[in-house]
Regions:
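Buried hydrophobic residues that stabilize the cores of well-folded domains
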Residues: 26-284
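Positively charged n-region of N-terminal signal peptides that target proteins for export
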Residues: 1-11
């Protein structure tokens, strides 16, 4: 049974879990509103095309993915309204299959492109990413340096330019390799914060506690799941333990166990967005 395509009828995704980290690549400007329906097309198990439509059902943007004979992504071409090219990203790999270069181009005309920035990647002998350096016009824009302990990411430093450490993340793990602590140092704002994580017996995130620089609890976020491991409810509490907000997901599944629908409800009783999925299956 091979999934060849999936269609998201509405754009908001399910409960997102806490992410603690940064990126070395410049962040592109995001639109204030994201068009809702997205169609994904897969071929031979690989994502080939992603089409985004606006609320009126008109094609808003398209991303086409190209791969080499090894199955490595080598190009990500982006198009806007009326299939007008907006830019593309190219990727290069070393003999080990490790991505060593990503170059981003922006479309000047329908046929002409200019380089926007590039990111070089470096690895240690174990294949762990140790450094990502982004440059624009030959000048270093940002660097992210990674350190590992026992094969797990232990430290991440995000530089603005070559030398100024804008932020730093320190990670700790339990015996099973689950992240239990993340300390974030913000050298721009002069602030330090911390997150501590606990998990269910199945390894799913159960609670995320946020602390300030003095070690006082700022907030607590709790998660619950259904039997399939999908997030069912997210509850946020303040420092005094009072419920601030909660969001619940309700799922329905098709005969193959894939999600058909996810309906979101907020703690005030208001309905959030509903995401519907249509899966196409290859015969045989």
């Amino acid at each position: 049974m091979k999934i060849t395509a999936a269609l998201l009828i509405s754009g908001a995704m399910m409960l997102s879990l806490c992410a603690c980290g940064g990126t070395a690549e410049p962040n592109p400007v995001q639109p204030t509103e994201t068009p809702a329906p997205i169609t994904y097309t897969k071929e031979d198990g690989r994502l080939k095309m992603e089409e985004t439509y606006n609320s009126n059902g008109l094609l808003f943007s398209t991303i086409i993915y190209e791969y080499d004979e090894k199955g490595q992504l080598v190009k990500q071409a982006e198009f806007g309204i009326s299939d007008a090219p907006t830019g593309y990203k190219s990727f290069e790999y070393d003999a080990k299959g490790q991505k060593i270069l990503m170059t981003s181009f922006v479309a000047d005309t329908a046929k002409d492109y200019s380089e926007e920035y590039r990111t070089n990647y470096e690895y240690d002998g174990n294949g762990n990413l140790t450094r990502a350096t982004s440059t624009r016009d030959g000048k270093i824009v940002s660097v992210t340096a990674y350190e590992y302990k026992d094969g797990l990411l232990s430290n991440e430093k995000n530089y603005e330019g070559e030398s100024f450490v804008a932020s730093e993340y320190k990670y700790e793990y339990d015996a099973g390799g689950k992240k239990t602590r993340c300390v974030r140092i913000d050298n721009i704002e002069g602030d330090t914060s911390e997150n501590r994580y606990t998990y269910t017996s199945d390894g799913l995130l159960l609670a995320d506690l946020s602390y300030d620089a003095d070690g006082k609890v700022i907030s607590r976020t709790e998660y619950s799941y259904d039997d399939n491991g999908n997030a069912m409810k997210l509850s946020v509490y303040n420092a005094k333990g009072a419920l601030i907000s909660s969001t619940s997901n309700e799922y329905t599944y098709d005969e193959y166990g894939n999600i058909k629908r996810c309906a979101v409800t907020h703690s005030d009783g208001s309905k959030g967005t509903t995401t519907q999925y249509r899966w196409e299956y290859a015969k045989g």
